[in-house]
Amino acid sequence: MSIFSKATYFFFIAFFTISISAEYKLGRDYKLIDNPLPVKKDGVVEVTESFWYGCYACYSFEPAINSWAAKQDADIKFKKMPVSWGPIHKLHARLYYIIESLKLDPSTHSAVFVTMHKEGNMLQRESSVKDFLSKFDVAPEITEKYLKSFTINQKINRDAKQAKQMMLT
């Protein structure tokens, strides 16, 4: 091993050791939100993942978060919350809630990510969402009904309010 290789190796070990052992400091590494979400008194911790199907980092992180969530005990409640910042985000949030409302197999969410990030179909129109869901035996008229659903609109509005409260950008 050359002296350069040894020096590089030492640098990375030292850097990552310092990074791992560093303590997080309020104001530097994180900040408290003005209106924290209420903490339940039953001892159950709620972990919320905010995501967007079109986000490559979310796609990359999906297997790890699903694996982590599957290993949690009953004292951890894991939920996903699609972001709805703009029109395309809202369409994808509707897609998320359609999949949930119809109780489609959870692997359908992974199929959305694959369709977008591997196949290049970003599902940017209601018609492409209908075509996508038809692969899972959902009739286009059912998808249309759910795309316009009052209940799904309520969920998206609730999520937008919660995202604002959590200061997600």
Where are these regions (language model features)?
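Extracytoplasmic thiol/disulfide redox context detector
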Residues: S2-P87, N157-A160, K164-M167
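C-terminal cap of thioredoxin/glutaredoxin-like
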Residues: I3-S5, S134-T169
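Functionally constrained cores in energy, signaling, and assembly domains
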Residues: T8-Y9, I20, V47-S50, H92, ...
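Short, exposed beta-strand "edge-strand" segments with a Pro/Gly-rich flavor and a Y/T-containing core
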Residues: F15-I20, G120-Q124, F132-D137
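General secondary-structure edge motif
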Residues: Y30, N35-P38, K79, H92, ...
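Structural alpha/beta surface segment adjacent to cysteine/selenocysteine redox centers
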Residues: T48, Y53-F132
